[in-house]
Amino acid sequence: MNRKQIAKGKLVRRFGINIFEQPKYDKILKKKPHPPGMHGKARKAKITEYGKQLIEKQKIKFTYGVSERQLTNTFKEAKKHHGVTGDNLLSILERRIDNVVYRAGFAISRAHARQIVSHGIIILNGRRVTIPSIILRANDQIQIKEKDSLKKLIRSNIEKTSSLRNLPTWIEVNADDLNIKVKHAPSRDEIPTLANEQMVVEYYSKRA
């Protein structure tokens, strides 16, 4: 296991949930269900309200692979929209182009999806893009660069991930043409629950 895998293993143990949505981390949690540095039934230290909010914020940060600055800016953007700020926050993060590539099964992880976008493999609405943080909108369409080796890679990824995750209802995927279409912005019930987003809103609201 390399250093990055070890670090991710510690994160899922710290949070007590497989935020990376990959089977190998389920195995780690099953084998070592307690946080790093805590053994067996050792008594947990009491966590303050701020500590709880920080943990939930970190869950979202590491789940989507965003920086502190990116998450802060996403929160500010979420506040500008009508509706529940926490729901808006998750909806924006879900619509990042790297996350959509991941959700569609074109990449085996979000980190891998970021690489795919950064390397110019993705065509968005007919134009090549290289920025993983682009936020998609309804009717946006993603295609793969016309190159046989790239298409072979993406098809292999789809095959590997098809049994591991459910395709979101808010995107449409054509596995034959390797095309993704955003049908609409996801509502809260269309987004997997990996963190308490309301606590994240409280965390940032107190620091606004």
UniProtKB/Swiss-Prot annotation:
Q: Where is the S4 RNA-binding domain?
A: 95-157
Task: Report which residue ranges the record marks as coiled coil.
Answer: none
Taxonomically, which superkingdom? Answer: Bacteria
Q: Which PROSITE patterns match?
A: RIBOSOMAL_S4, S4
Which keywords does this Swiss-Prot/TrEMBL entry list? Ribonucleoprotein, Ribosomal protein, RNA-binding, rRNA-binding
- Write down the InterPro entries for this protein, in alphabetical order: Ribosomal_uS4, Ribosomal_uS4_bac-type, Ribosomal_uS4_CS, Ribosomal_uS4_N, S4_RNA-bd, S4_RNA-bd_sf
UniProt keyword Ribosomal protein, yes or no: yes
MF (Gene Ontology): rRNA binding; structural constituent of ribosome
Q: Which HAMAP family does this chain map to?
A: Ribosomal_uS4_B
Summary of subunit composition and partner proteins: Part of the 30S ribosomal subunit. Contacts protein S5. The interaction surface between S4 and S5 is involved in control of translational fidelity.
Q: What does this protein do?
A: One of the primary rRNA binding proteins, it binds directly to 16S rRNA where it nucleates assembly of the body of the 30S subunit. With S5 and S12 plays an important role in translational accuracy.
What family does the database annotate? Belongs to the universal ribosomal protein uS4 family.
| Name the UniProt record assigns to this protein | Small ribosomal subunit protein uS4
Name the gene behind this protein: rpsD
